A protein has these predicted regions:
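AAA+ P-loop NTPase catalytic core
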Residues: 1-219, 312, 339-342, 366-372
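Conserved RecA-like P-loop NTPase ATPase core
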Residues: 1, 142, 195, 199, ...
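An amphipathic alpha-helix signature
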Residues: 196, 284, 301-312, 331, ...
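Residues immediately C-terminal
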Residues: 161, 227-231, 278, 293
Length: 372
């Protein structure tokens, strides 16, 4: 059986499929798609990111093979040649590496969206986002689910997979005249009252029982580490119960003595979290079922080399030729060392602190970027 990063119901996958199809099919007043093969290719692309969007790495490979076998289309694996509608691309291992472009009627590698990027000089290290295949497709998913469908979305992935950075980059691109954003960083001390009071600060009340974002704008709420709040005596995470009420019922009760119901309008939700374990609780399935859920995979070695070669290469641009000739070797050696540490030093009961992730690797390169 296929394994998902967190439990996902069948009906949730179908709802996610409908959301993606709705966001990619022509809207009212736009030209209809009349080519059956274009529609079928679009459907396959949406199936990959709905039924297969929350799968773990190994299951993604199995699901990809199943979809290809089920479609039984010609596979195009010639370098430099794109597969068209009615064909499947084979130049990369899986369909997860491709976007089906409806206008052009062909499968385009995500890698085509990340070429020619240069880091602006003097950018703080923690604000550098080097585009990769992963960030390109996550940005695409955010655009379609949040902006076009206006549905809640949840990114789940290990620490250091750039979930927060990708979402913050997405939020920073918004039209400030149309949208306002609010970010919550949940912890084990977060309470439902904290969340409600913070939201209240950003609302106008055109009537006593209706809340809308200030200035007539739409509001996108980003909740990071959503599974961190403490589970109470009754097995409930109170901030999660409040969010479930907001998303499912579209409102919340006033905390005053009258307990007036307030309808909350024009608010959309993005959440991110690492898989449950340690201080991270298992979320209520009734809460997660409200979201479009996507697994943010760990970057491949190829992506890691691209990221850190770009960062280090920018830093040593004005260094001597000797340094510029060896910086790629330094990147290769550091990534190899990191992979060896992860493989050979797993956490054990006596060494439970042996938890290494990509943030540790980033700290090494942050130190290298302080060299003069």
């Amino acid at each position: 059986p296929l394994e998902t990063i967190i439990p996902v119901t069948s009906i949730n996958m179908v709802r996610q499929l409908c959301c993606l199809l709705e966001s990619m099919l022509p809207g009212e007043g736009e030209e209809e798609i009349r080519d059956a093969e274009v529609l079928e290719s679009l459907f396959i692309f949406c199936v990959i990111w709905s039924f297969g969007g929350a799968l773990v790495d190994d299951s993604m490979l199995k699901f990809d093979q199943f979809v290809k076998r089920l479609a039984n289309w010609v596979v195009i694996d010639a370098p430099g040649r794109y597969a068209k509608a009615g064909q499947l691309p084979g130049t990369s291992p899986t369909l997860y590496e491709f976007e089906f472009n409806v206008k052009e009627g062909q499968w385009i590698p995500w890698s085509q969206k990340i070429q020619g990027y240069e880091i602006p000089m003097n950018t703080p290290f923690n604000q550098i986002i080097v585009p990769t295949i992963d960030t390109a497709r996550n940005q695409f998913i955010l655009d379609h689910v949040v902006l076009k469908c206006k549905q809640p979305i949840m990114f789940v992935g290990r620490s250091g997979t750039a979930k927060t950075a990708t979402i913050n980059n997405f939020l920073s691109s918004f039209d400030q005249d149309r949208f306002m954003t609010r970010t919550f960083n949940f912890s084990n001390c977060t309470t439902s009252m904290d969340v409600q009071l913070s939201l209240d600060d950003n609302f106008d009340y055109p009537t006593k029982d209706t809340a809308t974002p200030q200035g007539g704008k739409e509001m996108v709420v980003f909740i990071d580490d959503v599974n961190m709040p403490t589970v109470d005596t009754y097995g409930t995470q109170q901030p999660i119960a409040l969010l479930k009420l907001l998303i499912d019922r579209g409102g919340m009760y006033d905390r005053g003595g009258d307990l007036i119901w307030k309808s909350v309008q024009k608010v959309f939700y993005i959440t991110a979290m690492a898989p449950p374990g340690g201080a991270r609780a298992v979320l209520d399935p009734r809460f997660t079922s409200l979201f479009n859920i996507f697994h943010v995979v760990s970057p491949s070695d190829e992506s890691l080399h691209h990221i850190f070669n770009t960062i280090l290469g920018t830093h040593v641009k004005n260094f001597s030729d000797e340094i510029q000739h060896i910086f790629k070797t330094v990147t290769d050696a550091t990534i190899t060392f990191y992979n060896d540490v992860v493989a050979k030093l797993p956490p054990t009961p006596s060494k439970f602190h042996y938890l290494f992730n990509l943030r540790d690797l980033s700290r090494v390169f942050e130190g290298l970027c302080k060299s003069t």
